[in-house]
Amino acid sequence: MVTFQVPLKQEAEKPFRFSVAGRSVLLAGSRHGSVPHDTCCQLIQQFHHLGFRFFVGCAAGIDRCFREALSVSPYHKDCVVACAFSSRVYHARSLGLYASVVVPPGLTPAAALRRRTLWMVRRSSLVLLVPVDPTIDRWGPGSRLVFRSAMYHLKPVFVAALDPPPESVHYRLLPADLFGVLRGYWAVPHPFGDGGPCDDEY
């Protein structure tokens, strides 16, 4: 169990705490976006220090930023690159990363990408999402799918964006920074007990 602590705006209030049982993080975001290499490396190091392993997709943009950072990190063996197409496996393996097609054959490209995304979300404990597509200045469809499916599966998501996701009765939304590296918002499915997600609400 890994516990995260989020300070609240009212200084008198105790920090909000939530826990995740597993130790795998999905690194995801816009295929047109980017994160500086040093920032990716810092995030990877901080997550690995907590014992996390990594899932990352096969697309361009944010996926590529994290793949390249993982490839030169000491933790490259603790990463799975989930691919929608066999043609993308070779590039990830050429970086020294483990990669595999995770969808059944015969799907359309759009369906394969969707299935790959859902495969990663289901197997992750939490998600780091960089959702804004800079070409349109809003969330892309892939990022929306990641967020919706993570909430459905009760996985906390750190959204690295200037504007928060929409308010919802299904999760708590908290402005925060991640390891002092990224500013954004935690979206945390409603907790119970020691901080685990409450399946009974869904």
Regions found by a protein language model. Name each.
Residues 165, 184-185, 189:
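Helicase-associated low-complexity regulatory tails and linkers flanking the ATPase motor
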